[in-house]
A protein has these predicted regions:
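Extended, small/polar residue-biased N-terminal targeting/export presequences
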Residues: 52-126, 176-177, 183-205, 406-409
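Sec-exported extracytoplasmic/periplasmic mature domains
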Residues: 41-49, 63-70, 79-92, 151-154, ...
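Terminal peptide-recognition signature
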Residues: 40, 79, 83, 116, ...
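Terminal targeting/pro-maturation regions of precursor/exported proteins
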Residues: 2-93
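PDZ/PDZ-like domain segments forming the peptide/carboxylate-binding groove
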Residues: 109-151, 155-158, 226, 355
Length: 411
């Protein structure tokens, strides 16, 4: 069984599959569809974070699922989805083979569609935008974090899973999809998007000068895909050669992605120290450490907002708790659960919540987020205004760094 770590507006960790437990009946007596249902049940039984399985008898759930007529893959998929729905966890979900392949492409650095990172609100159940991908049709149309997607092509999203919603927004380049959007304090409105190829180069970098003429390296990281760590390391190296004396790392509207990518990026800024703790259902802790030489020890400010989620929060929390960076902006999204992706025997996939994470100071940020050292709220700005005088959070970060550079210069 193959395993793979991935992101989806959400944060995932490598996990290995061990023993499986017993069948409800001898393996030879099971159809392929029943074997698939049992395969999913065993993975959840072994790995799921909540050992009460949402306060239900998980063995009974298996028995009920296998008693249903499962005459084709679609029937098996339906039984699996119903079984997982009983956990009341939007992050533990089944992906049919097409959805699984699409998710693998998403984390590889290539994507086509409207460019939305989405999540189900665990309290309201509504389908929400985590963030639009930079330069995507969704961003160009003005979609924002926390926007509610009420309908897709006229169909209510009320009972859709994440993957069903994502599938309805996918389609050929140049095709149209209509969304009904709800935004707090505003009337519902329809937005028409034209699907396109989404560029997933995760790093934007350039050297800037503070009002006092101090060279500041500006880095914007848009997501943690397979290319993120390598691209960021290259950008830091280039800025160091150009004489950067301090850095701004912009994680605003970064929905996360691959956990390992977040850890690798944290190691680029830390010589030592804990990056993150993971806690499984037995309460056992694992941890990831920085062990090596940081790419730079220059002063660092991280920009965050409510669209900063998952792996972005791991990075921000690690550098804040280790005293390596100051955070400026708004409280982050609050996604502190870890999923692992399992490839199933028929080519479909299963994402399972297997653990939660804590920052180095043992903060559990799930549904709470990370509070910045300096809170600066601001109205949404255009992509062209990011990092300009119109960007109050960026200007506040420059001010913090300028003071740090003055202190360093007077020692």
């Amino acid at each position: 069984m193959n395993k793979q770590v991935l992101r989806q507006g959400f944060c995932l960790v490598l996990a290995f599959c061990w023993g499986f437990g017993s069948f409800i009946q001898p393996a030879s007596a099971l159809t392929q569809e029943q074997k698939l249902v049992s395969e999913v049940w065993r993975i959840v039984n072994r790995s799921y974070l909540d050992e009460t399985f949402n306060h239900q008898n998980w063995a009974d759930v298996r028995q009920k699922a296998l008693k249903k007529p499962l005459n084709n893959p679609e029937a098996a998929y339906g039984a699996i989805q119903k079984m997982l729905k009983s956990l009341d966890d939007p992050f533990t979900r089944f992906l049919d083979p097409e959805q699984y392949r699409s998710l693998q492409v998403n984390t590889s650095g290539e994507l086509t569609g409207v460019g939305l990172q989405i999540a189900l609100n665990s309290q309201t159940g509504s389908l929400e935008v985590i963030t639009p991908i930079e330069g995507s049709p969704a961003e160009k149309a003005g979609l924002k974090p926390r926007d509610r997607i009420l309908k897709i092509e006229g169909l209510s999203t009320e009972n859709l899973t994440l993957d069903e919603a994502a599938a309805r927004m996918r389609g050929p380049i140049g095709s149209i999809v209509t969304l009904l959007i709800g935004r707090e304090g505003e009337a519902e409105k329809e937005i028409i998007l034209t699907r396109d190829r989404i560029e997933l180069n995760p790093v934007v970098a350039d050297l800037r000068l503070s009002p006092q003429g101090q060279p500041i390296g500006y880095l914007r990281l848009t997501q943690f895909n397979a290319n993120a760590s390598m691209e960021l390391a290259h950008a830091i190296s280039s800025l160091e050669k150009k004489g950067a004396a301090a850095y701004i790392l912009d994680l605003r509207n970064n929905p996360g992605g691959l956990l390992q990518a977040g850890i690798e990026v944290a190691r680029q800024w830390l010589n030592s120290g804990t990056i993150v703790y993971t806690v499984n259902r037995q309460g056992l802790q694992g941890n990831f450490e920085a062990a090596g030489v940081a790419l730079t020890e220059d002063p660092l400010v991280i920009l965050v907002n409510q669209g900063t989620a998952s792996a972005s929060e791991i990075l921000a929390g690690a550098l804040q708790d280790n005293g390596r960076a100051q955070l400026v902006g708004e409280t982050t999204f609050g996604k502190g659960l870890i999923q692992s992706l399992f490839e199933l025997s028929d080519g479909s996939g299963l994402a399972v919540t297997i653990a939660k994470y804590e920052t180095p100071n043992h903060r559990d940020i799930n549904k709470l987020g990370i509070k910045p050292d300096k809170i600066i709220t601001q109205e949404p700005i255009t992509r062209q205004q990011i990092g300009t005088e119109a960007d109050g959070q960026y200007q506040a970060a420059v001010e913090v760094l300028t003071k740090d550079l003055v202190v360093v210069g007077t020692r």
